[in-house]
Design a protein with these regions (language model features):
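Small/polar-rich, solvent-exposed N-terminal microdomains that initiate assembly or binding
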Residues: 1-80, 186-191
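C-terminal tail/extension regions appended to the core domain(s) of diverse proteins
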Residues: 4, 11, 164-191
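Short, well-structured alpha-helical interface segments that form or flank functional binding sites
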Residues: 5, 64, 84, 118, ...
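Short regulatory "switch" loops immediately downstream of catalytic or recognition motifs
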Residues: 15-28, 93-104, 151
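Solvent-exposed amphipathic alpha-helical surface segments
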Residues: 17-25, 134, 138, 180
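Oligomerization/assembly interface segments of phage tail-like spikes and tubes
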Residues: 81-100, 104-110, 127, 162-179
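Short intrinsically disordered coil segments
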Residues: 104-115, 185-191
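Acidic-leaning, charged glycine-interspersed low-complexity segments
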Residues: 114-178
Length: 191
């Protein structure tokens, strides 16, 4: 199994096992106006890098809400024909405040607040629950739940950054691959 197979397997698993189970607000160009009518969508999954906004629109996928799949590092153990991969998942949500649809018919059309952080942590709780229950991801990865799951708000230089009305959190965990590619044949066959 290759590193790219691991990244693709995790992204596919997130798209089928996590994202369909939550709907979050989609950013709009008409933010915080009385006529504001927000949309809900399932998060999208992006591998390694978030696409530029125009490219995401062309393929009809939102960047936010979303999950960005990063490979943090890997470790091969050739004598055991094994490979470990450490992943970071960056969750992104957008929520500028309370909309009438959220609060009921008698509510104001829009009331700005900073409670959108609840959305990113509810998203994280769903993801953690799914990972705890997953033994295998596709036929490629085994979740190493015994090593635990590390999560935190997104930070830069050790400080939590305020990107209101966007909220971010990250999760790191490890997976094992069934077998690393045999090195002496791999280059001849695949490269």
């Amino acid at each position: 199994m290759t590193v790219t197979e691991g990244i693709h397997a995790l992204a596919k698993w997130l798209e089928s096992e996590v994202c369909p189970h939550i709907k979050l607000k989609v950013p709009s160009n008409e933010r915080q106006t009385a006529a504001y009518d927000y949309q809900l969508a399932n998060p999208s999954v992006h591998k390694m890098y978030a696409p530029p906004a125009k490219l995401a629109q062309q393929v009809n996928r939102e960047i936010c809400p979303g999950i960005l799949v990063h490979l943090v590092n890997g470790r091969d153990m050739p004598r055991e024909s094994a490979r470990d991969l450490r992943f970071r998942l960056l969750l992104s949500v957008w929520n500028p405040g309370l909309h009438a649809e959220d609060a009921g018919a008698d509510a104001a059309p829009f009331e700005a607040n900073a409670d959108g952080w609840n959305d990113v942590w509810n998203f994280m709780d769903l993801l953690l629950q799914r990972l705890r229950n997953a033994e295998q991801i596709g036929e490629v990865l085994r979740v190493k739940a015994e090593e635990g799951f590390d999560y935190k708000p997104y930070q830069e230089d050790g400080a939590i950054i305020d990107f209101y009305p966007f909220y971010f959190a990250e999760l790191e965990f490890s997976c094992a691959m069934a077998q690393a590619p045999p090195s002496k044949y791999y280059a001849e066959e695949y490269l």
